[in-house]
Amino acid sequence: MDHTPPPTSLAAALGLPRTLGRSAEVFVDGDLEVRFAARPTNGPQVPHLRDELYFVAAGSGRYRVEDKVSDVGPGDLLFCAAHVAHGFEDISEDFSVWVLFYGPRK
């Protein structure tokens, strides 16, 4: 990226084009990919090829990483290493997360 992208508000992110259950691209720069997911898939996700961070923007639910489950809500920061089984469960209608994939594919 040859410039700094403008700030993206939650309202703007909610308006990004996406398909149901999938995240929308916010921006990509080298080994960093920022996405936004409103109502992500409820249940297991396919393990990803890169480490990732989730930042809960709105709503509530449960976050499972392998066999550990945590209640999550706005402001929570969640980590998942590449190739690890994870997913969201029992998410509210307004649940949304910022998703940051970073580092090389593993």
Residue ranges and their predicted role:
Residues 67-82:
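Short acidic-glycine-tyrosine-enriched beta hairpin
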Residues 82-106:
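Ligand-binding loop in jelly-roll beta-barrel domains
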Residues 1-46:
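A short, N-terminal "cap"/entry segment at the start of jelly-roll beta-barrel domains
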